[in-house]
């Protein structure tokens, strides 16, 4: 199927796609802040440029969209493979997943812990808060 937009129009439209400060990321940031934790954003020195960074704890949080990052949970309805243009989408989305796994391994190698928050988890606010709190207090002797 041919694209209805010119290459320049498509480029302009795609350049406006937000990579930071998305609604899911903002929600996680508000929850973490309300739990009493302070963080830095998007530290480019770390593999994968995590969304939230807790430098003194050597911890990072990624907020992933289920579709783009291929949420492996089979019950996630947001991670379904598109039905058309599979020759484009399959390598694109599988490449994203492989990159994420590689970057997570790099974080492990330098001694950082990380948590991935999936877009579909945002609807279960209390469970998400508990998950974030458990991750961020892991190893605390308080």
Language model segments and positions:
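Nucleic-acid endo/exonuclease domains
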Residues: 1-142
């Amino acid at each position: 199927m041919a694209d209805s937009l010119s290459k320049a129009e498509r480029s302009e439209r795609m350049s406006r796609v937000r990579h930071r400060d998305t609604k899911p990321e903002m929600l996680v940031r508000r929850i973490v802040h309300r739990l009493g934790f302070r963080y830095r954003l998007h530290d480019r020195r770390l593999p994968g440029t995590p969304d939230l960074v807790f430098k003194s704890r050597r911890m990072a949080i990624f907020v992933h969209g289920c579709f783009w990052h291929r949420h492996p949970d089979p019950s996630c309805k947001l991670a379904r493979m598109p039905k058309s243009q599979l020759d484009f989408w399959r390598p694109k989305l599988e490449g994203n997943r492989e990159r994420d796994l590689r970057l997570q391994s790099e974080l492990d190698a330098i001694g950082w812990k990380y948590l991935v928050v999936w877009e579909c988890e945002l609807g279960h606010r209390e469970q998400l808060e508990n998950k974030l709190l458990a991750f961020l207090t892991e190893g605390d002797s308080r």
